[in-house]
Amino acid sequence: MSSQKRPSEESTGSGTKKVKLEETKTPSLKSEASNLALPKMNDSSNNINAVPLALPKGGDKKKKANSKTAQSGKNGGKEDGTGQKQKATDPNKMQDVLISAGVDLKEEEALLSSTVNVSKTQQNAVVIPPHPPFLHPDQVSNFMKKVAKTQNFNLSFTKNTEILDMMSSACESYLRDIITNTIVVSRHRRKGVKVNYGRRSQVAAALRSIAINQKKEEERRMKKRIALGLEKEDYENKMDSEETLHRASNVTATLRAGSKKQYGWLTSSINKPASIGVKSAGKVATEIAARGESGLKFREAREEPGIVMRDLLFALEHRRIGVHNIISKGYARIRD
């Protein structure tokens, strides 16, 4: 083997290059062509050739462009937001604009709060309270306990509230029916019955209208003469006619009841004055008195207004259960 010296380069800190001779041992059998090999590249050139070059893709370009626009928009938005905040935070200008437009902020805030409160109250008021009972549950339970003791069975009605509600509603419907019938009877009692007597002659209708007009004129003249002091009102004839009606009704009632007692509502309530005026002897008064009952006379039915005991008894007579004692006591009270 033969040794051969080859120059080598080393870099120093001062930037100068020193050439060294390195001894290389080469085999003797090697051909001369091996000595003519190309010089080797250093490590940096090998690394550059080893790494392949990557071309930029189209999606990467778009992403980079979008990121740049987003960053620029953020920066611009920050600047615009600060400018708007500075403009919006100027209270004097805003108040001046609102006042010039005729807007009151306090009233608007109050209106907004009131609408919110109203909506909340409406939502809370959706729940409808239950219907209050007609009778108090405690009173109903006590009464039912008394009835249960007489029937020799015990039951706690306070726990079963449905039974108490059912009894209260039943009593309410029962009393409502009785009161409705009583009101209907009272109205029919006070209302006159219209009877169709057939076709009337025109002559009779004309004569009746003439008589009614004459009586109205005579009564008008009589009132004028009494007001002027020319005649005095006759009380005796008026009271005598009403007394006769009361007596006749009392007699009819006694015959119906079979006793000598009289109804209190049939007794006369007219008090005669202590001093009765002297009978007038005027011409008009004598003509009216002479006519008497032969003339036209209008009289209202002597019926009590509203609901009376007999209306209630008539409504109870159509009931079958639990009304016999009440009806007998009611008629006894009317007789007394």
Curated annotation (Swiss-Prot):
The keyword Protein biosynthesis does not apply. GO terms for molecular function: chromatin binding; DNA binding; RNA polymerase II general transcription initiation factor activity; RNA polymerase II-specific DNA-binding transcription factor binding. It comes from the Eukaryota. Its main location: nucleus. GO terms for biological process: positive regulation of transcription by RNA polymerase II; transcription initiation at RNA polymerase II promoter. Keywords: Nucleus, Transcription, Transcription regulation. It holds the Pfam family TAF4. Residues 1-15 have a biased composition (Polar residues). InterPro entries: TAF4, TAF4_C. One of its GO terms (cellular component) is transcription factor TFIID complex. It is found in: Nucleus. Residues 76-90 have a biased composition (Basic and acidic residues). Residues 1-93 are annotated as: Disordered. Residues 141-209 form the Histone-fold domain. PANTHER family: TRANSCRIPTION INITIATION FACTOR TFIID SUBUNIT 4 (PTHR15138:SF14). The 1.2 MDa TFIID complex is composed of TATA binding protein (TBP) and the 14 TBP-associated factors. Belongs to the TAF4 family. Functions as a component of the DNA-binding general transcription factor complex TFIID. Binding of TFIID to a promoter (with or without TATA element) is the initial step in pre-initiation complex (PIC) formation. TFIID plays a key role in the regulation of gene expression by RNA polymerase II through different activities such as transcription activator interaction, core promoter recognition and selectivity, TFIIA and TFIIB interaction, chromatin modification (histone acetylation by TAF1), facilitation of DNA opening and initiation of transcription. This is Transcription initiation factor TFIID subunit 4. It comes from Candida glabrata (strain ATCC 2001 / BCRC 20586 / JCM 3761 / NBRC 0622 / NRRL Y-65 / CBS 138). The lineage of its organism: Eukaryota, Fungi, Dikarya, Ascomycota, Saccharomycotina.
